[in-house]
From Swiss-Prot:
This is DNA repair protein RAD5. Residues 75-98, 383-398 have a biased composition (Polar residues). One of its GO terms (molecular function) is DNA binding. GO terms for cellular component: cytoplasm; nucleus. Residues 13-23, 52-74, 373-382 have a biased composition (Basic and acidic residues). Keywords: ATP-binding, Cytoplasm, DNA damage, DNA repair, DNA-binding, Helicase, Hydrolase, Metal-binding, Nucleotide-binding, Nucleus, Zinc, Zinc-finger. SUPFAM superfamilies: P-loop containing nucleoside triphosphate hydrolases, RING/U-box. InterPro entries: Helicase_ATP-bd, Helicase_C-like, HIRAN, P-loop_NTPase, SNF2-like_sf, SNF2/RAD54-like_C, SNF2_N, SNF2_RAD54_helicase_TF. A zinc finger (RING-type) spans 900-945. It is found in: Cytoplasm; Nucleus. Belongs to the SNF2/RAD54 helicase family. Residues 506-716 form the Helicase ATP-binding domain.
């Protein structure tokens, strides 16, 4: 037997911060010779039946839970001493009931009536008898013989009786919630941190305390001052969950075991509960690490019922890629788990709950366990490879998302129900103020949207919020003593998914009065929403519209009262939030769809923002309030950030967050698919009666994409992420895919209306009759110099990849390899994109001075050339070649259709003139010069034998579409071949555009590229060809964008719109164009298809032809294979585990660099 340790043992409270005792055999008996005098109290605790130490036959708690942490029993114990230990499994026989042994256990004599009640109900089991005595359950059996009463729970009074009958219990009452209120009691195990005799005895009261840890000292770092720890994420040190119990004098004698301390500490720290302990058993001679059993009385504090602050827009935010859990996330998780654990321990059950949440607690704990495991993995990976983490983080955007991705067939299955559109759905006619004619499917959508908005339940009895549970305050404590009651407060309410408590009945607010219009791109979502704005107006708006003439004073109108939150109702106004590039389109579409004077629109952006939106839109200004306020996601985020900086104080705010709009519409709603982004949280906070989300893709590739939309719409109870995670995310990540997908389908079905362009009506007709669309791949051959640049970058990237494969560091160097692949893609567009700009500028200057002596420029107007040569001809020294040159230029101007002297084609293809003014086809001349050069001969003119070179060749350019020319003959210019020749892709594009201009001189086209710098290189080529063009990219202000789109729509004649894929890939209506040129492929063709659908959409009347330029034998060709397999280079796929995802990324890179 081990010797007692002194007070200053290594496990003294001042020397150890871990709530777990040291790893050694615990002493449940003092010494063999002490067994008869020291009662074995580890099995004599007044604990509830749910606790593992003791059990009650009346409760359905598995016996296998008993003493699951007691691993060893004393050897060579006498029959009597062995009977004092609880069995650790059901196989061990239980000692029979014996009065002498029983009284030895409890350390007291009992009366005959108590002994009779215990003996008759313990089933001849000594353990059950001890339990019944200490937890007081024997009393209910005694009461049965005196007066009838409803049975009470064994361990505590936390199970409240049915309140259906009258109570005649004299209890103390008050009218105010006290600082704390008893809720129940439970048993816990602790361990001693001090040695001594008679330190604790049965029945002693101990204090349950948390010692506040001093903040770590700030470290000074030179002149920069102290370095403070980051507040955003949890510190890497071990978490402090130590819970101490002390005597009344304040002397610490022990700590709670870690299992209980984990959640008890959270309840104390969060100021939810206060605990008071009673010693059930402690050895008379206490030694460090001895087991002590306590009964904890728990009281809920008044502060637990306070609400949380404004900044927590979501119930919990997502952890970013490979980052630690934030302090707020950890606090919320521990608060949730602690409340669930507490109610389990005190055997407290709700008297009213939602049927959907009955099994939620198990899932909630499972979700918390998964989060905890993830955090352990993150900390482990942080410790093993910090550089790798930083590398990975740098490659991710600030909106990195969590959650596993869906396979395509799973995504299709999710949409199947939403797309099972009933073509017999009733139709609704738009209001007479609406100026457009809706198609049948659009009228059906209008009926569906109006039904969703008008589905109000104000006449029904208020229902409890589905996330909350109702509990009743106990009437008696664990010792059957009456508890003071609060008048009008017999119940309280708990939300286990958010950790909130309330004394007031949590009424379920009006369910979602809106939805998701998820029609495929090009089916007219904007028009359908505008028809809803016209058709469904509030009563205040209708009254204001009818009375605007009859009443001279707007103060005579019915008003909605102001509330104390500084949020005013805007009953006449619909707020539209859209990407900046779509603001002008919404405004113009609203004007087109409205009859004159029926729709007031307000652009709330930049300099156009109203100084006081609240005064403009409030009910008291109903007659003058705008019907439609259009703003951008950026403005919403900006105002939300300003409001958050004031801790949500709206008293000084008169912008978007100061109003409760009649309706809010977010366009391109996939902008908020990441629930943890600031933009998403800002949109959640906007107040509105009706909420709509417009997107062609409500789920992009993760289930969490849908959650963010559900959160925005306020769909109870799914807008709570803990609830969503419990019933959807956890089953999905645990492999129960069908269960999770079934639940998501039930969420989607009532919320989403989705139609696609390939749907057929019952008559077999397409839903929308669109003109045909042809997509053609144009293979581009790189020139020798371009191929040299490409090969150089390709070999460098391949070498880097091979080296990292050998070293096993591919994922660590993923960003570097990916950047080199990006360089490869840029070199396919134009070599200059990957070169130093200064070097390129020097080369341009040198080339410009090459022919200065001859006075020839790269671009020359033919008229000025003829004038120049005519002037020379008039001189006395009339040289024959100059005279012939003037004559040749006049022939070109007069469109003399001479045949090519080399290939004998008539007329010439891309007519080109030599320095000696002889003409031939451009290709013929270049091939002729190359043939001469290959034979090591000096190239000479095929006609006059003068020396020629590529730099002396000028291509004839006719400006056929020049509407400014008054002359019948178009202007003609010469452009030097070679100097102005751009990359192979630009040359191919210009060839297509020239051919298109000849065939369709009035055609409009859109040129897409993901590289804005490449668009800048296309501009000079268009200028030289005298092709009119406009440009729209992300760097332009909203007004400039609106002007460009308006000019492109209104402009007559051959026009090109240069558009960046990011700025113009979504939302825009470009049906005035008929041709699309995709200059470079994207990883997913879906992104390109989105851009193409800006042209091929409802309103398009002509056939749309799409040309996709792809460089042969390059990374672009291999990207098409990646597209065909529906893969993404930067993301993982489907149900792969982390290792499989890494391997898949490596395989993708191998294919791109093969």
């Amino acid at each position: 037997m081990e010797q007692p340790l002194g007070d200053m043992s290594p496990w003294h409270p001042d020397n150890h911060m871990d709530p777990e005792p040291p790893t050694k055999r615990r002493r449940f008996l003092a010494d063999p010779d002490e067994a008869s005098s020291d009662p074995v109290a580890h099995d004599s605790s007044p604990l509830p039946p749910s606790k593992r130490f003791f059990e009650n036959e009346d409760e359905t708690v598995p016996k296998t839970e008993r003493l699951e942490t007691i691993d060893e029993k004393p050897n060579n114990a006498s029959p009597k001493s062995s009977s004092t230990e609880l069995p650790t499994s059901q196989q061990e026989p239980s000692p029979s009931f014996d009065q002498e042994t029983f009284e030895t256990f409890i350390g007291d004599k009992v009366s005959e009536d108590v002994l009779s009640a215990i003996r008759s109900n313990c089933g001849n089991n000594i353990e059950r008898a001890v339990n019944m005595y200490f937890d007081g359950t024997y009393k209910k059996f005694m009461k049965k013989s005196t007066r009838p009463a409803p049975p009470r729970p064994a361990a505590s009074s936390s199970r409240t009786p049915n309140v259906s009958g009258e109570r005649t219990i004299p209890i103390q009452t008050s009218k105010r919630m006290p600082n704390e209120r008893y809720i129940g009691a439970f048993g816990v195990e602790g361990w001693a941190t001090r040695s001594g005799t008679n330190l604790l005895k049965h029945g002693d009261i101990v204090k349950i305390e948390r010692q506040k840890r001093a903040p770590p000292p700030t470290k000074s770092k030179g002149k920069a001052g102290p370095v403070t720890p980051s507040r955003g994420f949890g510190a890497p040190r071990r978490q402090d969950v130590v819970v101490r119990f002390t005597t009344q004098s304040g002397t610490e004698v022990g700590r709670l075991a870690r299992e209980a301390a984990n959640w008890v500490s959270a309840l104390i720290d969060e100021k939810i509960c206060r605990f008071e302990g009673t010693v059930v058993y402690a050895p008379e001679r206490l030694r460090t690490n001895d087991t002590i059993f306590l009964q904890l009385r728990c009281s809920l504090l008044n502060s637990a019922f306070f609400s949380r602050p404004f900044q927590l827009a979501d119930d919990r935010s997502a952890a970013f890629f490979n980052q630690n859990e934030t302090n707020d996330e950890k606090t919320l998780r521990m608060r949730q788990v602690a409340l669930v654990k507490l109610f389990q321990e005190i055997n407290l059950h709700p008297t009213l709950t939602n049927s959907a949440t009955k099994d939620g607690r198990k899932g909630l704990l499972q979700a918390a366990e998964q989060d905890e495991e993830k955090q352990k993995e993150v900390k482990k990976s942080d410790g093993n490879g910090t550089n790798n983490t930083k590398e990975a983080n740098s490659s991710q955007s600030s909106d990195t998302e969590d959650g596993e991705e869906l396979e395509q067939d799973q995504l299709d299955a999710l949409y199947k129900k939403a797309q099972s559109f009933d073509f017999n759905t009733p139709e609704a006619e738009p209001a007479d103020t609406f100026a457009m004619t809706l198609r049948k499917y659009q009228k059906q959508a209008l009926h569906w949207m109006m039904a969703k908005e008008k589905d109000e339940k104000s006449h029904r009895e208020p229902l409890m919020h589905p996330l909350w549970e109702q509990y009743e305050w106990p009437l008696k404590d664990v010792d059957e003593n009456d508890l003071p009651q609060i008048e009008g407060q017999s119940k309280f309410y708990v939300n286990p998914y958010s950790g909130d408590l309330s004394l007031d009945f949590p009424v379920q607010e009006q369910h979602c009065l809106g939805g998701i219009l998820a029609d495929e791109m090009g089916l007219g979502k904007t028009i359908q929403m505008l028809s809803l704005v016209h058709t469904h107006r509030s009563e205040v708006a209708l009254e204001a519209r009818q009375s605007v003439v009859a009443r001279s004073n707007v103060n005579q109108l019915t008003r909605l009262g102001k509330n104390s939150e500084s949020i005013l109702d805007a009953p006449c106004t619909t707020l539209v939030v859209a990407p900046m590039s779509l603001l002008s389109q919404w405004q113009s579409e609203a004007e087109k769809a409205s009859k004159d004077g029926t729709m007031k629109t307000e652009l709330y952006y930049g300099n156009e923002k109203s100084s006081n939106l609240q005064a403009l839109c409030c009910a008291s200004n109903a007659a003058n309030a705008p019907d439609l306020v259009i703003t951008s996601y950026g403005v919403v985020l900006s105002e939300f950030s300003s409001l958050a900086a004031r801790n949500g104080d709206k008293s000084f705010h008169n912008g978007l967050f100061s109003l409760r709009f009649f309706r809010i519409i977010i366009d391109e709603a996939h902008h908020i698919k990441n629930r943890s982004s600031k933009t998403s949280k800002a949109c959640y906070e906007i107040s509105a009666t009706h909420r709509w989300a417009l997107t062609g893709t409500p789920i992009v590739n993760k289930l969490e994409d849908l959650f963010s939309l559900v959160r925005f719409l306020g769909v109870e109870p799914w807008n709570n992420f803990s609830f969503w995670r419990t019933f959807i995310t956890v089953p999905f990540e645990s492999g129960d895919f069908m269960r999770a997908l079934d639940v998501v389908q039930t969420v989607l079905e009532p919320l989403v209306l989705r139609r696609t362009k390939d749907m057929k009506t019952p008559d077999g007709e397409p839903l929308v009759l669109l003109p045909p669309k042809q997509i053609e791949i144009v293979n581009v051959e790189l020139s020798e110099t371009e191929r040299d640049v490409y090969n150089y970058i390709f070999n460098k990237a391949k070498r880097t990849f091979s080296q990292n494969v050998e070293a096993g560091t591919v994922m660590k160097a993923f960003t570097t390899i990916f950047a080199q692949i990006l360089r490869l893609r840029q070199s396919c567009c134009h070599p200059i994109l990957v070169r130093n700009r200064d070097i390129v500028a020097d080369e341009v200057e040198a080339g410009a001075a090459a022919d200065a002596a001859a006075g020839l420029a790269d671009d020359m107007d033919l008229e000025s050339l003829i004038t120049s040569f005519t002037a020379v001809t008039d001189k006395a020294s009339k040289e024959s070649n100059q005279t012939f040159g003037a004559h040749a230029l006049e022939q070109i101007r007069d469109e003399a259709e001479n045949e090519c002297p080399l290939c004998f084609e008539e007329p010439m293809n891309d007519q080109t003139v030599t320095g000696c003014w002889h003409s031939a086809c451009k290709k013929c001349l270049l091939d002729y010069i190359k043939h001469q050069t290959d034979k090591a001969e000096v190239p000479r003119c095929f006609s006059c034998r003068e020396p020629i070179n590529k730099r002396d060749l000028f291509e004839v350019v006719r400006h056929d579409d020049d509407s400014d020319m008054m002359s019948k003959k178009p202007r003609i210019s010469l452009q030097r071949v070679g100097v102005n020749a751009s990359s192979a892709k630009v040359v191919a594009l210009m060839s297509e555009l020239r051919a298109l201009r000849r065939e369709h001189p009035k055609m409009k086209s859109v040129v897409f590229s993901q590289f804005t710098s490449f668009l800048s290189l296309i501009e000079p080529a268009l200028t030289r060809a005298n092709i009119k063009f406009l440009r729209l990219d992300g760097s332009m202000a909203q007004k400039a964008r609106a002007a460009v789109l308006n000019e492109f729509t209104e402009k007559k004649g051959f026009t090109i719109l240069l558009l960046s894929l990011r700025a113009g890939g979504v939302g825009l209506n470009l049906t005035s164009a008929g041709r699309v040129f995709m200059m470079d492929p994207w990883w997913s063709f879906a992104v390109e298809a989105q851009a193409i659908d800006r042209v091929h959409r409802m309103g398009q009347e002509a056939e749309v032809q799409v040309k996709r330029f792809v460089v042969k034998e390059s990374v672009e060709e291999r990207m098409l294979k990646v597209q065909e397999r529906k893969k993404f280079i930067a993301t993982s796929l489907g149900m792969m585990n982390d290792e499989e995802k890494k391997l898949q990324r490596i395989e993708d890179i191998k294919e791109l660099l093969s």
